[in-house]
Amino acid sequence: MSEMKKTLVSGLPQLGLELTEETCDTLCAFGVAMVKQNEVMNLTGITDDRGVAKAHLLDSLTVMACADLTGKTLIDVGCGAGFPGVPLAIASGAKVTLLDSLGKRMKWLETVLPQLGIDAECVTARAEEAVAAR
C-alpha cells in the first residue's frame, strides 16, 4: 500500500468517514496524477505522498463530516488543481462542477477525470462570466 493511501485511510476515522477501497484507490489515483502533472505545470507546492493525502485529499473531504452531500449539486469556484471539488466528486455522491479561468488547468482536468472514471463537469470561465452566462 502506498504512503498516500496509508495516510488517507488512517485519516478517515478522524473525520468520521468510511470509504470503500475503490473510492480510496480513485482518490489516490487522482493525487498521483496531479503530482505527475505538477512536473510540467505548477499545480501545487505539496507533492509528497503524505502531504497530498493530508493537505489535498483529507482536507477536501472534511466537508463530508459536516453534511451529507449525496444527491446535492456543488460548484468549486476557482478549483485550481481540482481541490476540494474532485475528491468530493469521487467520494460524496454529489454532482460537482469545477470552475476555473485558467484554460491549461481545466484542459488537464478535462483529460484526466474521464481517464480515472471521475464524473465532474469542467467549466473554463471566470466566476462572474459563468454567472452572467446562466
List each language-model region with its residue ranges.
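Class I SAM-dependent transferase core
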Residues: 2-71, 75, 105-107, 111-119
